Each structure stands twice: as C-alpha cells, then as structure tokens.
Amino acid sequence: MALISSAAVTTINRAPVQANLATPFTGLKSSAGFPVTKKNNDITSITSNGSRVNCMQVWPPVGKKKFETLSYLPPLTDEQLLKEVEYLLRKGWVPCVEFELEKGFVHRQYNSSPGYYDGRYWTMWRLPLFGTTDAAQVLKEVAECKAEYPEAFIRIIGFDNVRQVQCISFIASTPKVY
C-alpha cells in the first residue's frame, strides 16, 4: 500500500480551486445588439440662449412696487380674477379677502428685522368664505370691499385649512395711484 503525504494531497487539491477563483466571469452577453450613441465632447455644439438675452427685461427697481404672486403682470381683469379664484376653489382652499389702506407691500417701519408690522399682515374683510363653491361670490366680496375702501389694496388668499397654511395670495385691486 502506498502512502501519500497529506501535504501533497492538499497541494494537488488547492491548485485547481485557486485557478477557478482567478478566472473572470464570462456569463454576460455582448452589448453588440444595443444601439450605441456617440458622445460629443465639443462645447461648441451646446445650444445657447444668446438670441433670447436681447429680449429679456429687468424689473425696474424705481417706481414699481412688487406686491404678491403675479405682481409682475399687469392688473388682472375680472375674468382673470375669476379663473384664479376658481383654481383655488378647485384645490379645496378657503378663499379670504384682505385689505390694506396704506402700504400694500412689504416695508420696514419699526425695526430692520421682519416682524408683525412689516406689511405682510393685512386686515381681513369679514370672515373667510368657508364652504364657498362659487368664484363669483368671492369677487362680489372684493367689489363690496372696494366700495367701502376705494383707495385700499385688496388681495385674495387661498387658505388650506387641513395643513393650516396660506397657499396662494394675489392682488385683486390696487389704488389708482399705483
């Protein structure tokens, strides 16, 4: 009977295992069937908005006040106001009419830091219109507020009473001076 050392058996058995561990995985298919797009690193091919820069305008900082949402647009017509109110009603928000008699824009009067008296808090016209489904009713409230205070800034806000946040705010009427 021939005796073989255990070291020789171990060496013989380990050699093929190490060779198998070193071979790369070749089970992936070739990507020859996929379409290939050629990358272009040339920066001159990037499109530019240079032609549109000439028609862009800057908001004039003197003589024009920015108020609320949409303040960069001309005053909204009654039809446009109706569509905005219909939008906030569709979202399920509660419409509310507010007015300001002096300054309808953010201003610092008593302190340099923001606070209660910086023009963001306006006087509420009556109560919020809970349960309102008709946009014309909201515009009727705006007209009544305007009749009572003709030289007031009037805005419409949309309040989400579930999240308890104001979601939209826009100017419905400004004094003739502005």
UniProtKB/Swiss-Prot annotation:
Record's keyword annotation contains Transit peptide: yes
Listed CDD domains: RuBisCO_small
A biological process term (GO) from this entry: photorespiration
Keyword 4Fe-4S assigned: no
Chief localisation class: plastid
Transit peptide: 1-54
InterPro entries: RuBisCO_ssu, RuBisCO_ssu_dom, RuBisCO_ssu_N, RuBisCO_ssu_sf
UniProtKB keywords: Calvin cycle, Carbon dioxide fixation, Chloroplast, Photorespiration, Photosynthesis, Plastid, Transit peptide
Role noted for this protein: RuBisCO catalyzes two reactions: the carboxylation of D-ribulose 1,5-bisphosphate, the primary event in carbon dioxide fixation, as well as the oxidative fragmentation of the pentose substrate. Both reactions occur simultaneously and in competition at the same active site. Although the small subunit is not catalytic it is essential for maximal activity.
PANTHER family: RIBULOSE BISPHOSPHATE CARBOXYLASE SMALL CHAIN 1, CHLOROPLASTIC, RIBULOSE BISPHOSPHATE CARBOXYLASE SMALL SUBUNIT, CHLOROPLASTIC 2
Additional detail: The basic functional RuBisCO is composed of a large chain homodimer in a 'head-to-tail' conformation. In form I RuBisCO this homodimer is arranged in a barrel-like tetramer with the small subunits forming a tetrameric 'cap' on each end of the 'barrel'.
Name used for this protein in its record: Ribulose bisphosphate carboxylase small subunit, chloroplastic
Gene source species: Trifolium repens
